[in-house]
Amino acid sequence: MQRIMKIAFFRREINPEIGALVAGYSMTDHSVMIEDDLFMTGLLCDDGENKILLISFDLQALDEWFIKQYRSSCGEILGIPASSVMFTCTHNHSGPQTICEPRYEHLLHRSYMDDLGKKILEETEKLTGKLQDADCFFYSSNVDENLNRRYVTPDNHASFLPSYNEMRPLCDGFADKELGCLFFMDPVKKLPLYIIGNYAAHPLAGHAPGLGGLKISADFPGAFRNYITAQTGAECMFVSGAAGDMIPKEDELGSDAARQMGIRLAKAALRSHIAATRNKDRYCMQNVKVGGLSKKFTVPLRKKYLDDQSNLPDFYQGSPDITLEIQCISIGDVCFVGLPGEPCAELGQEIKWHSPFRRTFIAFASTAYIDYVVPGNFLVSGGYEPRSHHFSARNSINFVKAAVDATYDLRESVYPSEGEPYPDYIDHPLVWKPGQQ
């Protein structure tokens, strides 16, 4: 029997007050104006048996305690496990202080967090009455809007590109260019209902020196959503990928840079939409099932954190190890992998390469905030990101392995194999042509 996907969604403004501390660059910058609104956007998918909820926030990050509390509460409202509720942040650097920074825990905007929690629960309560049928399409394309901010010399020494503008022409580090999209279509009217875009870049395009860093703004993810909605009528979500070392090509250049980058990504998403919907046999997923799963793993802290635990937020102090969570949710043959902190693109790409799903998208700052998560060799080459990598270098590969294991476990639970495990038994032709099964 054909399985009919149902979806419901919300969009809620989450601006702080003018004067609120602006997160991301310093602990002294206070906002002076709102340039464009911050939002949280949520999507509920129901396959008739299981549900998943994905919420994206125009925020820098959220603490683990907050994520766990409100994922659990949302799950109770919807009658689903907390592992089927995923939070992710765009990593916006033009919003309020929403995490407990080491030594600056007192600067957490607690009244804002209380209000945010109420808004999450209010919007989740409304979702079940909004469900409507939807066809689900997927599509990915490469879009050249980001670059790797690490310049690494032939003898493997890294420099932080934003501090050395003259090195930009030399920048050739790995960059994840994938713009991954999901399109939810009205099956009768054949019009788009909801669009998700996934791309890896710090939202820093609009953060110009001076006044540009004191404006409340969603940066390019907001411009992306606005353009999509204005042109299609569909609501829209942006999910940041593994953006730890990814920056916009026009980073820190102001409002126009943010707006134009968002529009260029949105145009690429519309091109993807056209291609996907005009080739339904290839890109429309059939009998879509959804699922969620989380996996925990424990790793030893680096000596710098063991010797001086004031480098850690209060709630991580007192232990030689740190326990982290990897979370996966799937919509058909597309998986979102929710990672803690700021994973670098190289790690995100490894997870994508090893996943058993047709397409895998990374969800940034999803399960906790633990600063940067880097490949082990970054601690050899240096640069900005490894300075705040929390755990032992040799465990970066275990981070990848835990995420990949989670993708396999989730796919097997949603689409159980018969006999030999998927995808081991697949025997593809040497050259695949559209229309082949």
State what each model feature region is.
Residues 241-246:
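Structured soluble/peripheral alpha/beta segments that form catalytic or ligand/cofactor-binding pockets
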Residues 265, 272:
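Anionic-ligand-binding alpha/beta catalytic cores of soluble enzymes and soluble regulatory domains
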